[in-house]
UniProtKB/Swiss-Prot annotation:
InterPro entries: Ribosomal_uL4 (IPR002136), Ribosomal_uL4-like (IPR013005), Ribosomal_uL4_dom_sf (IPR023574)
The protein's name in its UniProt record: Large ribosomal subunit protein uL4
Organism whose genome encodes this protein: Listeria monocytogenes serovar 1/2a (strain ATCC BAA-679 / EGD-e)
Region ranges (Disordered): 47-78
Lineage, uppermost ranks: Bacteria, Bacillati, Bacillota, Bacilli, Bacillales
Keywords from the UniProt entry: Ribonucleoprotein, Ribosomal protein, RNA-binding, rRNA-binding
NCBIfam families: rplD_bact
Biological process per Gene Ontology, one example term: translation
Length: 207
């Protein structure tokens, strides 16, 4: 089972924590991780693109010239697709790009990316993380204490308003509750900082 140092908020050592092998110690499956990231990114697409077909373009109700006798090609409407300003054939319409992957695949992906962070020594476990008031300066000092100077995802147990507000103005820092942890969020950040209570919640769901 993976063992990591447990850090206090001031960066000092608070002992060791043993992580669940089935969540943080599996052989990472990169293919599954990529599949889930693509699925989650597809779900974020708005899909609001829209063009007008010939029935939606304004005008074109009258036949532009008579059928025969003019020497010109027959036309039924000035809004048919070959005309300038005409309707579009087979153009994009509003749609959802979301698609679901099996639950087993999604669970394997989150376990894989968590295990990758452990293997790459990019997972930091905290004894706890609390702030009496929203203070960006204090949060920046905390990051310095634990030697984090890159993009970091901070996972806490449940909602923590003071922590979220303290981190809001720091570029590259995201705070989420343990229930919202996702493959895409973990992949977007270089380091994963997670509290001991959040580890227990994640293990409870995934183990």
């Amino acid at each position: 089972m993976p063992k990591l140092s447990l850090l206090k908020q001031d960066g000092t050592n608070a002992g060791e924590i043993t992580l669940n092998d089935t969540v943080f110690g599996i052989e990472p499956n990169e293919k599954v991780v990529v599949d889930v990231i693509l699925s989650q990114r597809a779900s974020l697409r708005q899909g609001t693109h829209k063009v007008k077909n010939r029935s939606e373009v304004r005008g074109g109700g009258r036949k532009p010239w008579r059928q025969k006798g003019t020497g010109r090609a027959r036309q039924g409407s000035i809004r048919s697709p070959q005309w300038r300003g005409g309707g579009v054939v087979f153009g994009p319409t509003p749609r959802s790009y979301a698609y679901k992957l099996p639950k087993k695949v999604r669970r394997l992906a989150i376990k894989s990316i968590l295990s990758s962070k452990v293997n790459e020594e990019k997972l930091v476990v905290l004894e706890g993380l609390t702030f009496d008031a929203p203070k960006t300066k204090e949060f920046a000092a905390f990051l310095k204490n634990i030697s984090v100077d890159t993009k970091a995802l901070i996972v806490v147990a449940g909602e923590s308003e003071n922590v979220e507000l303290s981190a809001r103005n720091l570029q590259g820092i995201t705070v989420i509750p343990a229930e919202s942890i996702s493959v895409l969020e973990v992949a977007k950040h270089d380091k994963l900082i997670i509290t001991k209570a959040a580890v227990e919640k994640v293990e409870e769901v995934l183990a």
